Amino acid sequence: MSRRVATITLNPAYDLVGFCPEIERGEVNLVKTTGLHAAGKGINVAKVLKDLGIDVTVGGFLGKDNQDGFQQLFSELGIANRFQVVQGRTRINVKLTEKDGEVTDFNFSGFEVTPADWERFVTDSLSWLGQFDMVCVSGSLPSGVSPEAFTDWMTRLRSQCPCIIFDSSREALVAGLKAAPWLVKPNRRELEIWAGRKLPEMKDVIEAAHALREQGIAHVVISLGAEGALWVNASGEWIAKPPSVDVVSTVGAGDSMVGGLIYGLLMRESSEHTLRLATAVAALAVSQSNVGITDRPQLAAMMARVDLQPFN
């Protein structure tokens, strides 16, 4: 098994991350800058996987006018770059964390993908993604890419690479789910929107997760925020609760969890071990200002503190 992974980020961003004790609307707010990172959900996943020793190739779209930060990151990390450069600028997302851990996002607009850009991407990506063990498709749709076009591409991709990991929201989530990817990771609110009803109890969440599985999705992982995560597949149902940590930033925590899930699945670990690992990687992410794993012993210690139980 070659254990190669590709991640696709159609709408990446520069994340400007800061800390503001309490945001006051209509006032001047002083913000402590904690970082400016070339990011995007699939890129964050790639960083985690690279730190865990997995060969990763990244793809999607980058704006021509401000691509240098991304190109430098890929070079520094030794990540193979298959991004398609288009006219315009990659967007900037401002993410502010308050003292209570609440994160407020300001997502700016960026480049627009033309029909010719999209046609080229579809043709090119489908020519090389089939060689990978797993493909992770993450994030939102850029301007110019319709949900219908995205569903069509995802469906064609699945015929070439059955193991698609999908993590998105809003219209992109709805569109991608129609292609029945192998693993999906919505949060509880996104699952409620898909189900068209509130899911107040854990049994309601599990019921909705099984409804997704009935559409041909093998693995459904529900992010529960500080409460951890729920994994539902053919083998059972498990709930993992992360250890308590000092929160620095929750930015990229969900992407870190996806990276942990992919790693465990690639290594053919059990569902229990994989969910424990993924929960620990996410907990590690919130305790630092940037995504990544620099201390493997620290990760192992975090794994030992994860509370994982089968759901009865």
UniProtKB/Swiss-Prot annotation:
GO molecular function, one term: phosphofructokinase activity
Active-site residues from the entry: 255 (proton acceptor)
Superkingdom field: Bacteria
CDD domains, alphabetized: FruK_PfkB_like (cd01164)
Activity across pH: Optimum pH is 7.8 in 50 mM Tris-HC1 and 8.5 in 50 mM NH(4)HCO(3).
Key words, A-Z: ATP-binding, Kinase, Magnesium, Nucleotide-binding, Transferase
Cofactor needs: Mg(2+)
One annotated GO biological process: fructose catabolic process
UniProt: ATP binding residues: 223-228, 254-255
Entry's EC annotation: 2.7.1.56
Record's cofactor remark: Can also use Mn(2+) or Co(2+), with lower efficiency.
Reaction equation(s) it catalyzes: beta-D-fructose 1-phosphate + ATP = beta-D-fructose 1,6-bisphosphate + ADP + H(+)
Entries under Gene3D superfamilies matching the protein: 3.40.1190.20
An annotated GO cellular component: cytosol
Regulation affecting activity: Activity is markedly stimulated by KCl. Reversibly inhibited by fructose-1,6- bisphosphate and ADP. Irreversibly inhibited by phenylmethanesulfonyl fluoride (PMSF).
Family label: Belongs to the carbohydrate kinase PfkB family.
Subunit structure: Homodimer.
Protein role: Catalyzes the ATP-dependent phosphorylation of fructose-l-phosphate to fructose-l,6-bisphosphate. Is specific for fructose-l-phosphate. GTP, UTP and CTP can also function as phosphoryl donors showing 60%, 20% and 10% of the activity of ATP.
Entry protein name: 1-phosphofructokinase
Species this chain originates from: Escherichia coli (strain K12)
Gene: fruK
